[in-house]
């Protein structure tokens, strides 16, 4: 009986840990569309961390970039190590001096929260 209780407890705690783990998806320029793609990479990963902190991750280097204010505050406070999103964000060819919109990526990442 004790072994079954311990096994049940371990299964519950491991499944709870899996649920608490941040979700990560990969999105590509092909999938999003060249006209909306905001990055200098062919694909990036998006994730939502506890507290709704959204990040873009470079799949080649695993460097992360804050996507919203919550994530930027985590980086500023030293809670998370990341580079500025401007490092991988491209210029908007239709609006000189402006960067491509991050809105489609923020929207996709929010669905992971």
Swiss-Prot record:
Residues 1-20 form the signal peptide. This is Uncharacterized protein YebY. Keywords: Signal. It comes from Escherichia coli (strain K12). GO terms for biological process: copper ion homeostasis. The keyword Signal applies. InterPro entries: YebY. One of its GO terms (cellular component) is outer membrane-bounded periplasmic space. It comes from the Bacteria. The keyword Endoplasmic reticulum does not apply.
